[in-house]
Design a protein with these regions (language model features):
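Membrane-entry segments of alpha-helical transmembrane domains in multi-pass membrane proteins
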Residues: 1-12, 28-35, 75-92, 130-143, ...
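Transmembrane helix-loop-helix hairpins at membrane boundaries of multipass inner-membrane proteins
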Residues: 1-8, 20-119, 192-210, 214, ...
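Hydrophobic core of alpha-helical transmembrane segments in multi-pass integral membrane proteins
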Residues: 41-52, 98, 186, 496-510
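Hydrophobic alpha-helical membrane-embedded segments
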Residues: 49, 340, 420-427, 499-521
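Membrane-interfacial helical/loop segments at transmembrane boundaries in membrane proteins
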Residues: 61-75, 199-205, 398-402, 472-489
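Hydrophobic transmembrane alpha-helices and their helix-loop junctions in integral membrane proteins
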Residues: 94-140, 149-451, 456, 462, ...
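Hard-cation-handling environments
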Residues: 445-508
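Aromatic-capped, Gly/Pro-kinked transmembrane alpha-helices
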Residues: 477-490, 517-612
Length: 612
């Protein structure tokens, strides 16, 4: 088999799994559906590793499948490509997806929608692979929309729950709004360059109008803001926790929310040419890093805390990408995928043991009955905090170093505060769930099944060792992404400041919550502000109410009393006129002769008057 053909294998195997599971969607749980889908993604992962090795040896591939759209001079083919950027992405996507599939076999074993779930899950993986393997913007957009559709189906998987329905609709609508911006960017690209192929577009940037590049980069980033839940399009991310927990692991670690970061990295020649937009992305990312972390400080929902940490970490990635450190952004995406999926799967174990209760203040003393899960979640939390030698240390510190080295000291300080917040809420969660006094009434909390724990093991290992791939990773990526200039920074001092601040934050969280929540100060203004997400969802609700009121007025007054009244009047007028003229068609010979004579007289009068 040619290696270019392997691209098709990697891409279409998850689709085959999705279609296979769909055949049994309305039937009772069939274990073979979960096993078959897991094997499909496993083979896809093996193929991705083979392709990664080829890319490592300076091989790049293109696979033209068929003409997709041909209209005049406009031609778009369904074609795939492999370079160093998406070689990393497909390995991350398929590895995390395979482990989530295996974990899901146990997690969803008692769910009536088992088969349907795997159909959606594999479809999700396929859509993400379309997004990252496409060699043009339109193909990327199709994968982009596929990811949005599958996320809607998975977030609202338990459609009998009103909260799940609302969350899925919110995610879908919010992403459709921002996707319109991305579509505008793609239209402008074709309008100005006459092509949507990455290579052709990027090769013509030097001769393009700067203002047009500015608009294109802004519109594309609007799309990224929706998928990666950047402020103010962030509210759907926490509500997406209504879906099954393994879905959260996939959305937050390897697929949907990383798509926006991937887009900026993929379009790095464009954003390097428009530095104002890049700087805005970095500033917004720093704000979101702090913003997301602050909301996690007080939240009591286990999954939402981890979700807010994703929001915060995406901010770090966008800071790196916005400052032109695209390789560092991709490296943090790479390491983050492992410890974030580990945290979500661990949360799923805890949720099952607690009989679906997610309030961390009503847990406690779970370390002994769930020792392995506790160890995995501690590993994930330490990696998230960025403590040496765990993976997060290498990637997050690189972002802080880049911000400081480029003299963006305010951004660096915001990221430092975000790191301190991250350490605090991470170990607040760990202490309240595993080590604080028992606050629940579950008699025998149990550990997850062995094969579910085994599926978490590779993630736990990678959360520890992935950072040590730093040097070969940057060497590999620098072949296609410009390297960041080396800056003279007091590296030892920066690392010391960050590490000491994070360790002090961890120590404070351990000390504060070792006996559970004892403080009664959780009713203050700041607490309520953070717990209610700065009241932004309520603001959106009020805005929606205004439009709902306007729509109601238009319906009740304009449509019913004006438009409908006009239409009804016209209808009644026609009916009345019809009744008047109906007598001419009553079949009475005398009446018909009268009308005939009247018609002749009218015609004669008309001719006499106008015929002169």
């Amino acid at each position: 088999m040619q290696y270019s053909s392997l691209l098709s294998v990697v891409l279409f195997l998850p689709l085959i799994g999705a279609l296979y599971a769909g055949l049994f969607g309305a039937k009772a749980k069939a274990l073979h559906v979960g096993v078959f889908n897991s094997l499909c993604v496993l083979v896809s992962f093996v193929g991705a590793v083979v392709l990664f090795i080829q890319a490592w040896h300076h091989q790049s591939y293109e696979k033209y499948l068929f003409d997709w759209i041909v209209v005049g001079n406009f031609k778009v083919g369904f074609s795939l490509m492999l370079d160093n950027i998406n070689a990393v992405m497909i390995v991350v996507v398929t590895l995390v997806s395979f482990l989530v599939h295996v974990y899901s076999i146990g997690y969803m074993e008692h769910d009536a929608g088992f088969n349907r779930y795997f159909s959606y899950l594999s479809g999700f993986v396929f859509s993400m692979l379309v997004l990252v393997l496409s060699d043009n913007f339109l193909g990327l957009f199709i994968g982009w929309e596929g990811v949005g559709l599958c996320s809607y189906l998975l977030i609202g998987f338990w459609y009998h729950k009103t909260s799940a329905n609302n969350a899925s609709i919110e995610a879908f609508v919010m992403n459709r709004i921002t996707d319109l911006g991305m579509l505008m960017g793609i239209i402008l690209i074709f309008w100005n360059f006459g092509t949507l192929q990455y290579k052709e577009v990027f090769s013509m940037l030097n001769n393009a109008d700067y203002s047009m590049l500015f608009y294109i980069s802004v519109f594309l980033f609007i799309g990224a803001m929706g998928k990666s839940a950047q402020f103010p399009m962030h509210t759907w991310l926490a509500n997406a926790m209504e879906g099954p927990t393994p879905v959260s692991a996939l959305i937050h670690a390897a697929t949907m929310v990383t798509a926006g970061v991937y887009l900026v990295i993929r379009a790095n020649p464009l954003y390097s040419a428009v530095f104002e937009v890049g700087y805005f992305i970095a500033c917004l990312g720093a704000f979101v890093a702090l913003f997301g972390a602050s909301m996690a400080l007080v939240n009591k929902d286990l999954k939402r805390i981890v979700a807010y940490s994703t929001l915060s970490q995406l901010g770090y990635m966008f800071v790196a990408a916005g400052l032109g450190a695209y390789a560092i952004a991709l490296f943090h995406l790479f390491t983050h995928a492992f410890f974030k999926s580990l945290l979500f799967l661990g949360s799923g174990n805890v949720m099952h043991a607690m009989e679906d209760n997610l309030d961390i203040t009503k847990m406690g003393a779970l370390y002994k009955p769930m020792r392995i899960t506790a160890i995995f979640m501690i590993i994930g939390s330490v990696a998230l905090c960025g403590i040496y030698p765990f993976a997060g240390y290498f990637s997050k510190d690189k972002i802080l170093e880049a911000a400081f080295g480029m003299h963006h000291h305010i951004l660096w300080f915001m990221l430092l505060i975000g790191a301190i917040f991250t350490a605090f809420y991470s170990f607040r969660l760990i202490m309240l769930v595993f080590f604080a006094p028992k606050q629940h009434a579950i008699n025998h909390p149990h550990e997850a099944q062995n094969f579910m724990l085994l599926s978490m093991l590779p993630l736990g290992v990678l959360a520890v060792i992935a950072g040590f791939f730093e040097e070969p990773f940057f060497h590999f990526i620098s072949q296609v992404i410009p390297s960041v200039e080396e800056y003279l920074v007091p590296l030892a001092l920066l690392i010391s400041i960050t590490t000491i601040a994070v360790l002090l934050s961890i120590a404070y969280a351990i000390f504060k919550y070792k006996n559970g929540i004892t403080s009664k100060k959780e009713g203050g203004f700041l607490y309520k502000l953070l717990l209610n997400q700065y009241y932004i969802p309520k603001l959106y609700q009020e805005i929606a109410k205004v439009f709902s009121t306007i729509a109601s007025f238009l319906h009740q007054v304009v449509e019913l009393k004006i438009i409908d009244a006009i239409v009804d009047t016209i209808g009644r007028s026609v009916f009345v006129i019809g009744r008047v003229f109906r007598i001419s068609q009553d079949g009475n010979l005398t009446s018909m002769l009268r009308f005939m004579v009247a018609g002749v007289l009218i015609l004669l009068a008309f001719v006499a008057f106008f015929g002169r």
